[in-house]
Curated annotation (Swiss-Prot):
<dbReference type="GO" id="GO:0022008">
    <property type="term" value="P:neurogenesis"/>
</dbReference>
<dbReference type="InterPro" id="IPR027900">
    <property type="entry name" value="Vexin_dom"/>
</dbReference>
<comment type="similarity">
    <text>Belongs to the vexin family.</text>
</comment>
<dbReference type="GO" id="GO:0005886">
    <property type="term" value="C:plasma membrane"/>
</dbReference>
<feature type="compositionally biased region" description="Basic and acidic residues">
    <location>
        <begin position="58"/>
        <end position="71"/>
    </location>
</feature>
<dbReference type="GO" id="GO:0005634">
    <property type="term" value="C:nucleus"/>
</dbReference>
<feature type="region of interest" description="Disordered">
    <location>
        <begin position="56"/>
        <end position="100"/>
    </location>
</feature>
<keyword id="KW-0524">Neurogenesis</keyword>
<dbReference type="InterPro" id="IPR040470">
    <property type="entry name" value="Vexin"/>
</dbReference>
<keyword id="KW-0472">Membrane</keyword>
<keyword id="KW-1003">Cell membrane</keyword>
<dbReference type="Pfam" id="PF15505">
    <property type="entry name" value="Vexin"/>
</dbReference>
<protein>
    <recommendedName>
        <fullName>Vexin</fullName>
    </recommendedName>
</protein>
<keyword id="KW-0539">Nucleus</keyword>
<dbReference type="GO" id="GO:0030182">
    <property type="term" value="P:neuron differentiation"/>
</dbReference>
<comment type="function">
    <text>Required for neurogenesis in the neural plate and retina. Strongly cooperates with neural bHLH factors to promote neurogenesis.</text>
</comment>
Length: 207
């Protein structure tokens, strides 16, 4: 006699077949046989209750299942009308291609919206070139005004800086962000040195 034991895990269901001789002589073997039969029933019930996969996917993984299940599944597949598959296949590309084209159009429109309008107009007309030049001039003027403000702020914070160091200050960014650490160290050293030299000079001046 053949008994099948089903073991269920999170991934698949495995089937183990055990062959037991039909002639059972001792009552111990009968008890073992009945307990094994109950065990197989319990395992099958648990596998039906606690399976995590959908029932449609189980026949695809049935490499170790009975051939009867395979035959049944094959009959179900052949019983379906063959005209349903081409209709689905022909309907799917239309549904998929429409969002793709809309996405492409949306991306193109989004990309066009990101491009500034001034270079596009400057290619077509010469009047817009003057507009672009004035826009660039205003931007440069704004940057220069910001740079002069930062330079003024730096001169107020570091009054003992030499003229070359003031000229080499960055136009944008604050003193802590835009200035590198090496230049800050050099400026602080020069400041301390100038204060020290001034103190010694004032000591040797005549009263």
């Amino acid at each position: 006699m053949m008994h099948q034991i089903y073991s269920c895990s999170d991934e698949n269901i495995e089937v183990f077949t055990t062959v037991i001789p039909s002639k059972v002589s001792s009552p111990a073997r009968r008890r073992a046989k009945s307990s094994q039969h109950l065990l197989t029933k319990n395992v099958v019930i648990e596998s039906d209750l606690y399976t995590h996969q959908p029932l449609e996917l189980l026949p695809h993984r049935g490499d170790r299942r009975d051939p009867g299940d395979r035959r049944r599944f094959g009959r179900l597949q052949t019983a379906r009308p063959p005209t349903a598959h081409p209709a689905k296949a022909s309907a799917r590309p239309v549904g998929i291609s429409e969002p793709k084209t809309s996405n492409l159009c949306g991306n193109r429109a989004y990309g066009k919206s990101l491009i500034p309008p001034v270079p596009r107009i400057s290619v077509k007309t010469s009047a817009s070139a003057s507009l672009e030049a004035t826009a660039m001039g205003t931007e440069k003027g704004a940057v220069l005004m910001r740079g002069s403000r930062h330079l003024k702020k730096m001169t107020e914070e570091y009054p003992a800086l030499p003229q070359g160091a003031e000229a080499s200050l960055p136009l944008t960014g604050s003193a802590s962000c835009g200035v590198p650490g090496i230049l800050r160290k050099m400026w602080t050293r020069h400041k301390k040195k100038s204060e020290y030299v001034g103190a010694t000079n004032s000591a040797f001046e005549a009263d």
